[in-house]
Curated annotation (Swiss-Prot):
A Pfam family assignment: F-box
SMART domains xref list: FBOX, Kelch
Origin superkingdom: Eukaryota
Kelch repeats: 96-141, 152-191, 192-238, 240-295, 367-413
Cross-referenced InterPro entries: F-box-like_dom_sf (IPR036047), F-box_dom (IPR001810), Kelch-typ_b-propeller (IPR015915), Kelch_1 (IPR006652)
Domain F-box: from-to ranges: 41-90
Keywords from the named record: Kelch repeat, Repeat
Name of this chain's protein: F-box/kelch-repeat protein At5g26960
Source lineage: Eukaryota, Viridiplantae, Streptophyta, Embryophyta, Tracheophyta
Length: 413
């Protein structure tokens, strides 16, 4: 790939960006310099980065992979945060629920778009593990967490980080976390990834790491007051929420503390690098899934005989006086008196004004059978959607069969 562009590479772009010379209405009389020896292609090639971005940010998503191979300069601009910002400002981005999983044979990923009347999963990735080097020395991607920054999904596991670009359809290995950990909280704040908690020792659980995708570098930014294992992450208005999980360490009264941790969340203000006052879900229970959507943190909790669904007002900006308030919402349409025992697990993802609850592990029919109940019809890979505007649940298309133990995220592309 050359560093600069030539006329052959972007002649198609000129046809869409320049006015039709045969259309008199599209022509505007402008001042012409005295020396016009350079042709139009040279003029396009000499555009500064900001003006060139204004042009290429308007192309259809399907054309973006072609733009990336024009030259190194264009590829660099396509990967810049400003390109994503321009497309967002122009209303050219769409949101999808993204699920990725690893099995012995390879990696599989699929996305679900809610904009169409009949939403169905589209398998967007199916590759061998060896082809991307996630086996052997790079460790395993099992039990990974996923976080998306625009169109790029970062699959973060104990020993490896894999980046999938939904625009380009490419996979790349990135720098792993400083402290190998599993079952940790993860979220994105201002274009950077934050992780906290997880198994791997007391020192590991206390360290909060920040990942800069531009520099491909991790660093420890603070220490957690509470060391959590099996926690969940979310982010709203510059705050990283570390939710649920169990207490780890050698402190006394561990059983009591674990129950308290399971229904509480710690709040880390990324800009000030300060911890805010911790909050707890009313009524206790054990948080089994959580996510952020439209300014709120949504939490699914498991109790002795039921599931409950809550939202926490996380809007701190704009003079909102309701910050910190909890509200109980309509529970998901699952069999009554279901108590999750760890064999069935859910992932919660905010997608625009909807909350997707995805069954990523286990079979509810088996759970009911073990409790002596005979209901059937809810097996595995269940996907439920909660409309935050209407306050109602509906069932979406189940996960594809090859997507098991998935890591889920909302992709903007």
């Amino acid at each position: 790939m050359s560093e600069n562009c030539n006329s052959r590479h972007f002649s198609w772009l000129m046809k869409s960006c320049l006015p039709n010379p045969s259309d008199a209405k599209s022509l505007v009389q402008i001042h012409q310099p005295s020396s016009t020896a350079a042709n139009s292609s040279a003029t396009i090639a000499s555009l500064p980065d900001d003006l060139l971005l204004e042009c290429i940010s308007r192309v259809p998503s399907s054309s973006i992979p072609s733009l990336a191979v024009v030259c190194r300069r264009w590829s660099r601009l396509l990967h810049s945060p400003y390109f994503l910002h321009l497309r967002r400002r122009l209303g050219l981005l769409r949101h999808s629920l993204f699920a990725i999983s690893t099995v012995d044979s390879g990696l599989f990923a699929a996305d679900l778009q809610f904009q169409s009347e009949i939403a169905s999963w589209k398998v967007s990735l199916a590759v061998s593990s060896r082809s991307v080097g996630v086996d052997g020395s790079y460790g395993s991607l099992s039990h990974a967490r996923a976080a998306a920054i625009g169109p790029r999904v970062y699959v973060v596991s104990r020993n490896a980080v894999l980046r999938y670009d939904s625009w380009m359809g490419t996979l790349n290995l990135r720098s792993p976390m400083i402290f190998p950990r599993k079952k940790f909280a993860i979220a994105v704040v201002s274009g950077k990834i934050y992780v906290a908690g997880g198994g791997g020792g007391s020192e590991v659980a206390a360290a909060v790491e920040e990942y800069d995708p531009e520099l491909n570098r991790w660093e420890v930014v603070t220490q957690s007051a509470r060391k959590r294992y099996g926690c969940i992450g979310a982010a709203v208005d510059g705050v990283f929420y570390v939710i649920g999980g169990l207490k780890i360490g050698n402190e006394t009264s561990r059983a009591v503390a674990a129950r308290a941790y399971a229904s509480s969340m710690d709040l880390f203000d990324v800009e000030s690098r300060q911890w805010l006052r911790s909050r707890s879900v009313p009524g206790g229970g054990c948080v089994v899934a959580a996510c952020a959507a439209v300014g709120y943190v949504y939490v699914l909790t498991s109790h002795a005989v039921e599931l409950s669904f809550w939202r926490f007002d996380a809007r701190r900006r704009g003079g909102n006086s309701g910050f910190g308030e909890w509200q109980r919402l309509k529970s998901p349409p699952l069999p009554a008196q279901v108590r999750l025992d760890g064999t069935v697990r859910f992932s919660c993802v905010g997608v625009e004004d909807k909350v997707a609850v995805v069954q990523v592990v286990g079979c509810i029919d088996d759970l009911l059978r073990r409790s002596g109940r005979g209901e059937r019809g809810i097996r595995e890979s269940l996907v439920l959607l909660y409309d935050t505007t209407e306050g109602e649940w509906r069932r979406a298309a189940d996960l594809p069969e090859m997507i098991t133990r998935a890591a889920c995220a909302c992709v903007e592309w």
